[in-house]
Amino acid sequence: MADYLLLFIGTVLVNNFVLVKFLGLCPFMGVSKKLETAMGMGLATTFVMTLASICAWLIDTWILIPLNLVYLRTLAFILVIAVVVQFTEMVVRKTSPALYRLLGIFLPLITTNCAVLGVALLNINLGHNFLQSALYGFAAAVGFSLVMVLFAAIRERLVVADVPAPFRGNAIALITAGLMSLAFMGFSGLVKL
């Protein structure tokens, strides 16, 4: 049980996919202008990352490895992610049309989010079992969502802040992301994986 807790905390805080591994930067910068949109994108990405991580592990373990087709791993995982994203898009469209309109083009772009593919590939490379794969996918998604929501809240405050003209927009956003990354580095002594 302690190993699973360490895996969760380590993935969310210490080895955060956005701030440490630099995966998922496109939605991090693109969807984080409004808190509401960032929260919706975080929830959708959490669902997709967790489900894609589980499906990728199952396909790798039950199909690719037994049939000696591991060279198709990346292609198979991309197809799995695309199917999961389409399923998520249908669910969001039915349950929350307002969120579906807010997310716009970013929902289908989860398919190309390198963090989702990164989770699936890292699960295999790290040798995780089924439960560890599910937890790792969920923890990576929670870390992604946490950073997205924090960054969106900061960016909303930066809009009304007195920022010098050369630093307005993406410049101050990148500086803020760098400072957030430094803050998350403080967690590095918390858990050793």
Swiss-Prot record:
Name of the protein: Ion-translocating oxidoreductase complex subunit A
PANTHER family, A to Z: INTEGRAL MEMBRANE PROTEIN OF SOXR-REDUCING COMPLEX, ION-TRANSLOCATING OXIDOREDUCTASE COMPLEX SUBUNIT A
One Pfam family here: Rnf-Nqr
GO cellular component annotations of the record: plasma membrane
UniProt-listed InterPro entries: Ion_transpt_RnfA/RsxA (IPR011293), NqrDE/RnfAE (IPR003667), NqrDE/RnfAE_oxidrdctase (IPR050133)
Domain of life: Bacteria
GO BP: electron transport chain
Keyword set, alphabetical order: Cell inner membrane, Cell membrane, Electron transport, Membrane, Translocase, Transmembrane, Transmembrane helix, Transport
Taxonomic path: Bacteria, Pseudomonadati, Pseudomonadota, Gammaproteobacteria, Enterobacterales
Organism field: Klebsiella pneumoniae (strain 342)
Enzymatic class: translocase
